[in-house]
Amino acid sequence: VNPTVYSIEKNGMDHADCIMCVSELTRRTVINEYHQDPRKVFAMHNAVYPLSQELLDIPRPEHPKEKVVTFLGRITMQKGPEYFVEAAALVLQRTRNIRFVMAGSGDMLNAMINLVAERGIADRFHFPGFMKGKQVYEVYKNSDVFVMPSVSEPFGIAPLEAMQCGTPSIISKQSGCGEILDKVIKTDYWDIHAMADAIYSL
């Protein structure tokens, strides 16, 4: 924890009359780690807007010979990208008829490219870079499975967006959105074997 950031955050909370959190997970953190009065801390989950007709009309291509499994987000420690790569390596020991996509940018991108090469799975992995707007929904619709292996996620909007596109999702138990999503598979972010089993089963 960065003490300067913590001090600024706590000072703001100390002077607030009401603190709105995006999940019960975050609410507990605010109460326990920032020592706030539970009576002024409330959880209000995030939501997504209904898709526009333009996004609804994005075609969903079929992948009869290969499945596509996607990670989409910041490629940083908080998002757990290395667990996605390690789980992918385990899945590819069982079958080669899968392609993995890591869409996004971040300070761990080069490390993930190197890790993929070390695991010998570069021919099954794609790094298309940062996505925005309509591109994000095109990626979701091109995916057979979406994975969010976050180490720490106050909420996490991406699985809701993926599910809007009809893409089944696997999320970490450490994600706040898991409090409202019951039609997803949940694993611990560090349990790459459970994550690999979930990917393979879908």
Protein language model regions, located:
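Aromatic "clamp/platform" in nucleotide-sugar-dependent glycosyltransferases that forms part
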Residues: 151
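Conserved acidic donor-binding segment of nucleotide-sugar-dependent glycosyltransferases
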Residues: 184-193, 201-202
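Carbohydrate-associated surface elements
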Residues: 25, 47
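Short hydrophobic beta-strand element within catalytic cores of glycosyltransferases
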Residues: 168-171
